[in-house]
């Protein structure tokens, strides 16, 4: 039988982890090192993630410091951050870029909550797809005579309970992120 509760849980956890990383990339008006995770810097004859050419730290709630290790890459890192679409304007200070995080206006907050909602819905869909795969495995196992009808029903309920628990966790994560975004 190809059904595995551990596999289903692992895949559902993966959907939640993916949601968490998506949420980390949303600018909430508060400084976070994860805010710059998606930035790619043209360096060394290719495109390199910012985290591989610099260290990012939070100076205070509204300031990030990016310490670029190679001074020849500072300008490229500055341009990459400005062109990222995050609305950030770094200030060069030697090999360090200081990035003030501007407060969000109401319109942008509403827009970010909608984006967060889309990310959460994608996570719910991923969880439901894992449920569907698990249910299909159970149906096949019952059809092939590997499990009884009663065992099939019990395992189906188990998969549904897991799904409900993970969807609830997605909803809780969304509620927390929306509260963080709307906080002035």
From Swiss-Prot:
Leader peptide range in chain numbering: none
GO biological process, one term: cytoplasmic translational termination
Keyword field: Cytoplasm, Protein biosynthesis
GO cellular component, one term: cytosol
A GO MF term: ribosomal large subunit binding
Protein family membership: Belongs to the RRF family.
HAMAP family per UniProt: RRF
Name the UniProt record assigns to this protein: Ribosome-recycling factor
UniProt source species: Hyphomonas neptunium (strain ATCC 15444)
Gene name in the database record: frr
């Amino acid at each position: 039988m190809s059904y595995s509760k551990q596999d289903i849980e692992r895949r559902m956890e993966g959907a939640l982890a993916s949601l968490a990383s998506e949420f980390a990339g949303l600018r909430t008006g508060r400084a976070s090192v994860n805010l710059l995770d998606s930035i790619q810097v043209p360096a060394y004859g290719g495109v390199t993630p910012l985290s591989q050419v610099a260290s990012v730290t939070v100076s205070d709630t509204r300031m990030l410091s990016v310490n670029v290790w190679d001074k020849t890459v500072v300008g490229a890192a500055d341009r990459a951050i400005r062109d990222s679409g995050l609305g950030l304007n770094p200030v060069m200070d030697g090999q360090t870029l200081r990035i003030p995080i501007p407060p969000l206006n109401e319109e942008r907050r509403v827009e970010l909550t909608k984006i967060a909602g889309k990310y959460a819905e994608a996570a719910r869909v991923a969880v439901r797809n894992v449920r569907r795969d698990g249910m299909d495995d159970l149906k096949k196992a019952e059809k092939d005579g590997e499990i009884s009808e009663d065992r099939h029903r019990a395992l189906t309920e188990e998969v549904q309970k897991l799904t409900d628990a993970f969807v609830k966790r997605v909803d809780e994560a969304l509620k927390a992120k929306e509260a963080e975004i709307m906080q002035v």
